[in-house]
């Protein structure tokens, strides 16, 4: 059986002119690049974290379309997670809610990220899993933000004094050690 990876993604159509799934950044950027770079030797569940009143993502017809689109790809599925009770914009609480659900669902690894990520490197999932396994599944890893290299000051790059790893890939041990 494939190792199961939970991908935790808050998203919103608030203040955006989207009316369909295919209008969204999640479809146009995230999914299109993910599908070109993911490792089909793993199984994935996207945990899409949405507001109950979101004009696009809470629409049941659009939700069905999103699930159908994702499910047509090898080893991919998707669940919607409600932000009910979480103050608007509190992304860490959103990630934590999805992390807990993914943990309960049996995911071995978790990737917290935004809906606007563009993946460029094939094999990034396998590299992330292997990096964690080398350290008994303790630690944090994930893909590099190439924009930092093109546009960034060296202090914001990996190893730099002000580097912040915002897209984190962790194992179940992270939850066992730190909780949500």
Language-model features: where?
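Alpha-helical elements of Rossmann-like donor-binding domains used by nucleotide-donor carbohydrate transfer enzymes
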Residues: 29-33, 65, 93, 97, ...
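Short beta-strand-to-loop acidic/aromatic patch adjacent to the donor-nucleotide binding site
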Residues: 107-118
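Active-site beta-to-alpha loop of glycosyltransferases that engages the nucleotide-sugar donor
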Residues: 9-29, 52-54
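Short loop->beta transition adjacent to catalytic acidic/histidine clusters or analogous donor-positioning motifs
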Residues: 4-5, 37-47, 76-78
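Conserved catalytic core of nucleotide-sugar-dependent glycosyltransferases
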Residues: 118-180
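Short, acidic, metal-binding catalytic loop of nucleotide-sugar glycosyltransferases
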Residues: 23-43
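A conserved acidic beta->alpha catalytic loop
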Residues: 15, 49-63, 118
């Amino acid at each position: 059986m494939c190792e199961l990876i939970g991908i935790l993604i808050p998203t919103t159509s608030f203040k955006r002119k989207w009316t369909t799934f295919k209008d969204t950044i999640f479809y146009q950027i995230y999914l299109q690049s993910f599908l070109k770079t993911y490792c089909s030797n793993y199984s994935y569940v996207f945990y899409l974290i949405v507001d109950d009143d979101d004009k696009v993502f809470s629409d049941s017809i659009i939700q069905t379309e999103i699930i159908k689109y994702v499910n047509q790809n090898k080893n991919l599925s998707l669940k919607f997670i409600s932000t009910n009770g979480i103050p608007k914009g509190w992304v860490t609480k959103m990630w934590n809610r999805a992390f807990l659900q993914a943990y309960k669902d049996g995911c071995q690894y978790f990737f917290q990220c935004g809906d606007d990520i563009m993946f460029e490197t094939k094999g990034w999932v396998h590299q992330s899993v292997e990096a964690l396994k080398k350290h008994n599944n303790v630690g944090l890893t994930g893909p590099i933000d190439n924009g930092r290299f093109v546009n960034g000051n060296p202090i914001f790059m990996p190893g730099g004094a002000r580097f912040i790893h915002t897209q984190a890939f962790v194992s179940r041990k992270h939850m066992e050690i730190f909780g949500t």
